[in-house]
C-alpha cells in the first residue's frame, strides 16, 4: 500500500537546491571564492601588475566601490600586501646584516628620493638645510657599506659564472640567423688585403673640446618615425621573444641590410657630397665605433671598410672624399652581446606606437649652442694667448685705455705714402695748425669750435678706416716685417723734435712704423714718474684754460658734434673690427683732446707725431727724443669726463671688454675663408653686443676653420623629391665640423615623443627624438647594473648627432626576459654621467684616425683594431697579387663569431644611486645588506604579512651561513638548503 501511494502521489522533497552553489554547497570553487587567501590566478595577476603603486592608492580604489562585502575587502587587502611585499630572492645568500636599522634605511631612502637629483645650490636645499646635511652625513656611512656589498656581488658573480653563459634556445636560434645574414654582407667587399700602414690609436697632440664636434647644417631628412611607448599596463613587462614573432617583426635579412647599408653606395650621400664637398662621409654606427675606444685597455675589436674617391669639381680642382662604411661583424662575441642582439628587436617593437610623423618635422637639434661661461672664458683666453702673444706680440692684459694717442703717422699701412693718404692727411694738418698758432690768451669763439668739431668728425672717420688697413697690413706682413719697422720707429721722432720749424706733414712722418700702436701699450708700463708728473701738469694747465673760455657755447657745439661723430663711427664700423676699438679710441681720443686744448698750445708749431705733441704740450725743448717720450702717457681718466668729445667711446670699450654672454649662436657657424663679408652699412652697430666678438678677425681662433660652409650653402634648401626615401624607417643627413674637417654623417631618429619646447614655453609642444638603449641585467635581484663605458659612449654619440634627444634605458632581466625597469635619462643627467668618460681623449683618437685617412691615396682600405691593442692596422686591397701575408677577409668571416676566452667573469657593478620600486616601498637602501628584523608588531606594520617572532641571537658566518630560512618571504634571502655549484 505504501508502494501504491508512492506511485500514485508525488514524492515529497524537503531538500532545497542551494542558491549559491551548483550541486554541492562546499565545492572547491566556492571555497576559493569565500576564502581570504588569494588564488593562483590573483597571485599571477599581482606578480605582473605595475610596480610602484602604494597601498594607499590600492585601498582608495577599493573604497570607491559601491557595495563590497567584508570577505572581498579582506581578499583585496591580502592581494595588495602580498604583491607589494614580495622581494626578489638573491642568487647567493647575504653574508650578514646591514649596520643600519630598518628605520634608518627608510629614512635614508626618503632623503635619497628627495635630494638625489637636486643640485646643492637649489631652493629645496636652502629651505631644508638640516635634512640635506643629514643626507650628506648618512651618505658617507652608506658608501662604506656599498663598497662591501659590491665586493659581495662580485664574489657572487664568480660563484654563479654559468649565469653569464646562459642563452635560451630561441635566443640562440634568432642570434644565429641575424649573424649569418650579417656575414653574407661581408662578401660584397674585396677578399684580399695587404698591410699598408700601422699607426697608433692615440694622437700626439691634445684636442680642445670647445673646438670639437659642431653641427653645421641638417641637410636632408627622409622617411618617417614612430612615437615611443613608455607606459605599459603591467610591470615587469614580458617581451615577445619566440622564434616565430621576431621574424614577423623584422626578418634577419632586413636587420643585416639596414646595419650594413654602405654610405659609399648611397645615392643621396653622393649628391650631397658633390654639392657640399665634405672631406669625410660616414655612418652613425662607424662614428660610434671610432669614438668607442677607451684607454688604456682598448678592449673593443672592430673592422671598418673605407673607400677613398676623387670627385671632379666643375671649375676647380678635384676633391678627395673618404667614405667610412659601417663596421663589419665582430670576430668574437660574448654571450652578453648575443643576448643584447636578441632582446633589441622585441624591445624596439614593444616600445613603439603605431602612429608616425615625417622625420623632417622632428625638433632634432637645439637652435643655439648653450656654452657655459667657464668654457667661453677659457676659450677666449686661450685664443688671445695663442694669437696675440706669440704672433702679434700684443699684451691684452695691459690697460690700453690709458693711452692718449698713437699719432697720426702710424695709420699708414705701408712705408711709402699713396696719393690718397697724402690728400687725406693734408686737411687734418690744416685744421690743427690754426689753433696751434693761436694766442693762448684768446678764447676761441663758438663758430671756430664748431668748425673744429666738424673737422674732428672727419678725423675720426679717416683714422678709423686707416686703422683697419693698418692691422690688416700688420697681420699680412708677419712678425719679421714688424721687427724691421721697430728698428726705424724712433728716427723720425728725433728729427721732428730737433727741427720744430719744419712743416707739420712730411714724408718722414708717413714712414713711421706701423707697430707703434702695439708697442706703445708696453712702453706705458716702463715710463718714469717724471714723465707722469709732467703729464699731470700739462693736463691741469689744459683744464684751467678750458675753464676760462666761453664754455656755454663751446661745450654745446662740441657735445653735439661728438655725438654725431660717435654715431658715424658706429654706423660705419663693422663687427670685424670690434676688438680693434681699443686702439681706435685711444687714437681718436688724442685728436679730440688736441682740438679742445688747442688754445693752450704754444706758438711753436706742433707735429702730428705723438712724441712731438707730448713735448710741445709739456713745454719741453729737448733736441733728442728718448723712448719714453715718444709715446704719450695718461695716468688718470678724469680728463675724459665732459671735455672729451669721444668719452662715450670709452664706455663702449668697457662694454666690449666684459665677458662674453652665455649664448653664442654664431660660434658654430663662423667662416673666415669662404664666406663673403657683408657691406659695412649692413653690419650691426651695437658695440656692446657680445655676439660680435666671435666674428672678429683679430684673434684668428675665433674664425671658422677652413672647410666650413659658405653662406650661400648655409641657406640652401634641398628638394626631397630629388632623393630616394627609405622604405622603412628614416635617414637624416647632417653636416658636422671637427676643427678644419667637414663630416657628412648619415644617421636616423629611433623614436620620438611630444613634450614642451622649453620650460618657459610649456604650451608649445614639439616632437623630440628619443633613443632607447636595451640593457640586459644579470643581477636584477640585487639592483640595477651601472652603465658601461660603451653604453655611455653610445648615449653620448646620440646626443652629438641629435642634441635635443632624450634617453631611455630598458633594463631587462636576463633570466626571465622581462622589462622590469624603464629608466629615463635627461640631458642634464647624461652630462653628469659623462664625467666618467675622457671625452678629450676620444675626440683625439677620432681626429687622429680621420687625419691619417686624409693622407691616403685613392682606393679601398680596411681599418682593423684588435682587442686590447693600442695600435691600428690599415690594410689596402691587393692589386691582383696575393701573397702568403695577405689578409683574407672572407675566410675570416666565414663562420659565426666565437666566444672570447676570459679568466674573469664579465661582471658589471651595480648603480647604488638608482632606486627600484621595491626599494622605495620597503625602505631599502640600494646596494646594502638587509637590515636586522624588528619585533613582530613592527614587522607586521611594515610588511603587511605575518612575520616570525623568534629573534636571531647567533652570529652569521660570512662564508657558510645565510640568514635564517624564516625570513625568506620578507627579506628576500635564499634558503640555507640551497647549494650553489
From Swiss-Prot:
Q: Transmembrane segments in this chain: where?
A: none
**Comp. bias (Polar residues):** 671-686, 954-969
Stretch list, region Disordered:
406-427, 475-516, 591-627, 669-690, 930-981
Could you list this entry's UniProt keywords, alphabetically sorted.
Answer: Nucleus, Phosphoprotein, Transcription, Transcription regulation
According to the UniProt record, list the residues that bear Phosphothreonine. Answer: 575
Q: How does it assemble?
A: Component of the little elongation complex (LEC), at least composed of ELL (ELL, ELL2 or ELL3), ZC3H8, ICE1 and ICE2. Interacts with ICE1 (via C-terminus domain). Interacts with ELL.
UniProt name for this protein: Little elongation complex subunit 2
Name the source organism: Bos taurus (Bovine)
Underlying gene: ICE2
